[in-house]
Amino acid sequence: EMMEKEEKYNFKRAVFLVDWAYNDGKPSYENFCHEIDSITTTLKAFIRINDAYKYKTAPNWAIFEYFTKSNPMNGNKPFVYDFDDFMGKQDFNKLLVTKILKTHTGQCTSMPLLYKILCDELGGHSKLALAPSHLYIKHIGEDGRWVNVELTNGCFARDEWYMQTFGISTEAIKNGVFLCAFSNKENIAFIMQLLASSYQHKYRNYDYFTLNCSSKALEYAPNFSQALVIKYLNLASFKKSYIQTIGKKKSDYIIRVNKEMHATLNVLDSIGYSQISDEEYQQNVERALKETETMKAKDR
């Protein structure tokens, strides 16, 4: 409904529902909203005390301070990157917002999701954007130009940094695969793929629920890379199950699955999609953190 009807769009609730489904109906939406409201109230007071309401980026500034600096707003506990199981392969909660709210440790999924929820609640402007295996925040600065907020190391990054660090092609940018601000529909498409991934992690299976998550997203965002990847993984799982059960016997079903797999790969290739290994990603984050510490040391 959130993709089909703009009036039903509610990013905060969409993010919550993934958490709620994965954790068997916990926490309650009321408790989740109460925690978000509490943070939002603190951020509003911070903006008011600093007389920053005259700036359109006041919400972005307040949230960045909340995430990255030791201050009373966050209990003198800034948010830091959690390198332990950062892809959520052992515990999918590592990717979810309720975990980061409790621990102030997160990674490139939970940090931007919480940032955007808070920014929406404050009436500010923020967008999600993708790089290979990475999610980050974009918003319009006071000068009308895009600003990239990199919460994993508490800095602002240029597009060129993402291109060099993650090996992003100009083709992928032109096709809206990477470094491009999500629309509301793409926000929900991303959350649907997060839901599909959480389902697969919980039940150790791709099935027609996970396929439906990707198919529904692709109806509204045909080149959305996350959905194309989930679709391909579904089809590959169906093919594997078929071979294990029936063997390599040809049938209309397996011919159709193979055809869809090739078509999906062709789309991913044509739009410039690329990915990096977990090891490469960890090295990128560690390098970025070291660069940040070096810059901070020079400023002292």
Task: List where the protein language model places each region.
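Amphipathic alpha-helical repeat scaffolds of TPR domains
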Residues: A181-K202, N223-T245, S274-M295
